[in-house]
Amino acid sequence: MAQVWLSGDNADAMLEALTPTDVAGIAEGRVRYSMFLNETGGVLDDLMIARLDGMLQLVVNAGRADHDIAHLEAYLADGVDMTVRRERALLALQGPAAPDVLARLGVDLDGFFFMQVGHFDIAGIPCIITRSGY
């Protein structure tokens, strides 16, 4: 998976032009599943869109990351800053025991529900956790 962060006054509108998603309607701390569309409405790839710290944080598929990033760059709007976070790792911890595993590491997910995103510390390491999946 690759992580791309978008910020700026036109970030919502730019991403709304590339996906069928009400990006402006994604509240702070929330995540939505979406897909990139081509000019005729065909699906190019799927992605996750999160709003955290006032910016859009995208997770795109590893196998198509270069294509997805190029697609974003081709349609990059004025007033939008795009940062590809290649220095960040993504770990998918999935399944019904995932909250228990994180609890053993001191992470309390009580009140943290499906399709939310937030900041947590795991063993003293600052992390961003989404409670999502598809």
Briefly describe each language-model feature range.
Residues M1-Y134:
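Basic, glycine/lysine-rich polyanion-binding surfaces/domains
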